[in-house]
Amino acid sequence: MSSVIRYDWTAEELHALFDLSLPELLYRAASVHRQHFDPAEIQVSTLLSVKTGGCPEDCSYCPQAQRYDTGVTAQKLMDVDAVVAKARQAKLAGASRFCMGAAWRSPKDRDIPKIASMIREVKALGLETCATLGMLNTCQAQALKDAGLDYYNHNVDTSPDFYDSVIHTRQYQDRLDTLAHVRDVGLKTCCGGIVGMGETRQHRVGLLLTLATLPAHPDSVPVNLLVQVAGTPLHGTQTLDPFEFVRMIAVARITMPRSMVRLSAGRESMSDELQLLCFMAGANSIFYGEKLLTTANPETERDQALFQRLGLRPMHLMENVSNQDQHHGNVHADIACKHVV
């Protein structure tokens, strides 16, 4: 199957891919995948919550929203040294990228210098850096880039026409605007969504269509399977057919051939066999470590054993990322623009 990079996909084309027999869809996705990646290599990231809980948003899936009683206790922003210690552990375990997440609607300008210090120190360990901090304005995005940030994660979560069923405190366009700010300063984008929230296949098509028709495909596309947390509105939602999840991975791979397609939240509940199908469908990235922000993730030893059984190996740093212009000196700590989106 052709792996020409396209930005003009249609909903009809994506529906046609979803409607293929699963063996045929897997074959097409694997063919595209092999044109751009070594199928035996998996990029490994670790995600750390550097500021947990207390988020003012109402995302129906999120245990960190302060309005839901989920047992998550709000915490302050971690100290830089503690974050660096976690990053060292992640590197020793085989991670090549370290992502720092904060439960904010958007960061305050006063928080940016400390985040910038985290980025510089983690970068100095030889790791790629990623951050997910909520909505950014252009000035904040530039400050993070100047600190050496490689990737910024900001998911669109779902399709535009299902979005209002899940979130009311932030508009879909707000998410697209943040992605534009991130692209404008030259940061790489990490953007995906969540499935299993009660959406239909049409909504899953809409999510992938949004991603595949962005001005530039996300460099990383995290595909999350809903982790149902007691106390959140989506707790008790009917679970998604595992084969439908595999189809989601395969269509993401076909429509965004050069993107890293990441198995993200929900992997704890997946069998080894289901994960293998996802790798065959074009997934080539995972989150490593026992926790993803506040939810469980497979233990490192389990992932290492799975890699060994399947003959997979961790991917080394991507050259086009590690050779980016990096500034390890002074960061723009005193941000020129003072309004926060």
Swiss-Prot record:
Cofactor dependence: [4Fe-4S] cluster; [2Fe-2S] cluster
Residue span(s) of domain Radical SAM core:
40-267
Q: A GO molecular function for this record?
A: 2 iron, 2 sulfur cluster binding
User: Which top-level enzyme class is recorded in the Swiss-Prot or TrEMBL entry?
Assistant: transferase
Task: Report the EC number(s), separated by commas if there are several.
Answer: 2.8.1.6
Q: What metabolic or biological pathway is this protein involved in?
A: Cofactor biosynthesis; biotin biosynthesis; biotin from 7,8-diaminononanoate: step 2/2
Residues annotated to bind [4Fe-4S] cluster: 55, 59, 62
Intrachain disulfide bonds: none
- Cofactor note text: Binds 1 [4Fe-4S] cluster. The cluster is coordinated with 3 cysteines and an exchangeable S-adenosyl-L-methionine.
What does the entry give for GO biological process? biotin biosynthetic process
Q: Where does [2Fe-2S] cluster bind?
A: 99, 130, 190, 262
Which keywords, in A-to-Z order, does the entry hold? 2Fe-2S, 4Fe-4S, Biotin biosynthesis, Iron, Iron-sulfur, Metal-binding, S-adenosyl-L-methionine, Transferase
Taking the record's annotation, the residue ranges forming a coiled coil are none
Catalysis: reaction(s): (4R,5S)-dethiobiotin + (sulfur carrier)-SH + 2 reduced [2Fe-2S]-[ferredoxin] + 2 S-adenosyl-L-methionine = (sulfur carrier)-H + biotin + 2 5'-deoxyadenosine + 2 L-methionine + 2 oxidized [2Fe-2S]-[ferredoxin]
What Pfam families does the record point to?
A: BATS, Radical_SAM
* Functional note: Catalyzes the conversion of dethiobiotin (DTB) to biotin by the insertion of a sulfur atom into dethiobiotin via a radical-based mechanism.
Could you give the subunit structure recorded for this chain?
A: Homodimer.
Q: Which family is it part of? A: Belongs to the radical SAM superfamily. Biotin synthase family.
| Protein name per UniProt | Biotin synthase
